C-alpha cells in the first residue's frame, strides 16, 4: 500500500504554486506578497483586508516570523511590481462510497437541541463583582458539546463570544495549556485536519498539538485589539483573544489592573474605578518579601476574576486553548506593592490534582514586566510549592518555544549550583531530582542538552564543561552588579490544600 495523507488520499508531489501579477482590485485573503518591513522586502501572507478612511489596509503575517509581528499595513507597503503567490483552490470533498452504517441499538440517542443557559453578565467585564460567582448551569457543559461547527465563519470574535459580546455558556471553561512551537505550515495542516474531527477529538487535538483556536478560520489568526491601557502602561497585544466583538473597533481597551475587568469606553472605565475597591488579587497572600508578594487564587471561588485573567493572558500567549471552566485550577499571582495596592506582574496556573504530575499548566509574565527576572521567579516558586508538597513536578508538556528556553536556563543553573557543591563527590540523577523537585526526565534531558553527560569506562558520568562554568561565573558577576531576585523558602506561608472531589474536577 502506498503512502497516504491524513485524509486517506495517496500522497504525491505538492501542487504547484500559482504565481502572477496582482493589483489592489484583485488581491485577496490568502495571497502571499512582498511587503516593506524595516527597510527590507519580506514575504507575507494576507490574512484580512479592510477599508479605512485613507484606503485599503491589509493584515499580514510575515512568513517564517513569529505571529506577534503580524500587523496592519497600508497598501503602499505592498510591492505589487513582483509576482504574488495565489492561494491554493479548495479541493471538493469526496463522498465516501459504501453502505451507510446503521445506528447501534445499544446506544441511546442524545437530544441535540437542549437549551443552553445564558452566561452571567459579569463575564462581560462590566459592573463586575469579584465575589463568589453564580455556579453556571451544567446545560452548557461537556454533555452538550455536539459535533456541530458554527455556521457563520465570518464572526470577528471566536465562537466563545456571542453576538451581544458575552462569552457563550457553551465554553464555560478556560484552560490555557502550553504547547509546542509550530511553524505556519504545521498550523495550517492541523487546522485543515480539525475540520474533519468531532468536538471531543478536536478538543483533545487542541490540548496537545498547539493549534491556536478551535475554529479553523483565518479570522481567528487576526489580532483583534490594537492597544490596551492597564494601570500606567500602554500595551500592544500580540495575539488574538476572544474579547467581545465590539471591542475590535475600540482604539483603546481599558483594563482594571486589580479586578481585570475590561471596558471599551473610557468614561465607563473611570466610573468603574470610583466604585471598585479591590487592590490585590482576590486570594490568600502566601508569600511576601521586600519586593514581591504571591497570592493563591482558587478558580472555583473566584471564577470571574480568573476568567478575566485568562482572557488577558491569551493576548500574549500563542497556541493556547481557551475554555471557560477555571474550577480545576489554582492561580498563583505574583505582584509588586506600592501605596496604591498590589500590581499584577505575572502568574502561573496549576491543576488541583494532576494525574501526570504536572506542577504548572500555564505561565506568563506581563509584557511591561518582562526581561527583569520575574519569569525565573515564577518557575522557582512553582518548584518551591512542589518541595513543600514533597513531590517532584514538571511543567505541562510540550512547552512553548519561549517557555522551553526559560525552563532550560532555570534547570541548568539549578543543577550546576548543586554539582559545584564542594561537599558532594557523587550524585545520581535520582538524587538530583529529589533535591530540586525536578523529574528525573527533566534532569536527564537538561544534562544531555548541555553536554554534561558522558560515557566513560562503562558508566555514565556528569561533567561540567568549561563553557557551563564560564557562563555561571558571568551570571554571578552580573548579579553582583545588578542584584538578583530569589525566592526565600522561609517566607512561604503555605500548606498543600486539600480539595473535595467536586472542586477539583471540570464543572460539566
Curated annotation (Swiss-Prot):
InterPro entries: Acyl_CoA_acyltransferase, Chromo-like_dom_sf, Chromo/chromo_shadow_dom, HAT_MYST-type, MYST_HAT, Tudor-knot, WH-like_DNA-bd_sf, Zf-MYST
Residues the record lists as binding acetyl-CoA: 361-365, 370-376, 400
UniProt site positions, description: Important for catalytic activity: 362
Domain MYST-type HAT: 220-496
Enzyme Commission (EC) number: 2.3.1.48, 2.3.1.-
Modified residues (N6-acetyllysine): 320
Feature: compositional bias, Polar residues: 119-131
GO cellular component entries: chromatin; NuA4 histone acetyltransferase complex; nucleosome; nucleus; piccolo histone acetyltransferase complex
Zinc finger (C2HC MYST-type) stretch: 253-278
Post-translational modification: Autoacetylation at Lys-320 is required for proper function.
Gene3D superfamilies in the record: 2.30.30.140, 3.40.630.30, N-acetyl transferase-like, Winged helix-like DNA-binding domain superfamily/Winged helix DNA-binding domain
Active-site positions on this chain: 396 (proton donor/acceptor)
Catalytic activity: L-lysyl-[histone] + acetyl-CoA = N(6)-acetyl-L-lysyl-[histone] + CoA + H(+); L-lysyl-[protein] + acetyl-CoA = N(6)-acetyl-L-lysyl-[protein] + CoA + H(+); 2-hydroxyisobutanoyl-CoA + L-lysyl-[protein] = N(6)-(2-hydroxyisobutanoyl)-L-lysyl-[protein] + CoA + H(+); (2E)-butenoyl-CoA + L-lysyl-[protein] = N(6)-(2E)-butenoyl-L-lysyl-[protein] + CoA + H(+)
Region spans: Disordered: 84-150
Subunit annotation: Component of the NuA4 histone acetyltransferase complex.
Free-text function comment from the UniProt entry: Catalytic component of the NuA4 histone acetyltransferase (HAT) complex which is involved in epigenetic transcriptional activation of selected genes principally by acetylation of nucleosomal histones H4, H3, H2B, H2A and H2A variant H2A.Z. Acetylates histone H4 to form H4K5ac, H4K8ac, H4K12ac and H4K16ac, histone H3 to form H3K14ac, and histone H2A to form H2AK4ac and H2AK7ac. The NuA4 complex is involved in the DNA damage response and is required for chromosome segregation. The NuA4 complex plays a direct role in repair of DNA double-strand breaks (DSBs) through homologous recombination.
Family of this protein: Belongs to the MYST (SAS/MOZ) family.
Name under which the protein is recorded: Histone acetyltransferase esa1
Source species: Emericella nidulans (strain FGSC A4 / ATCC 38163 / CBS 112.46 / NRRL 194 / M139) (Aspergillus nidulans)
Gene: esa1
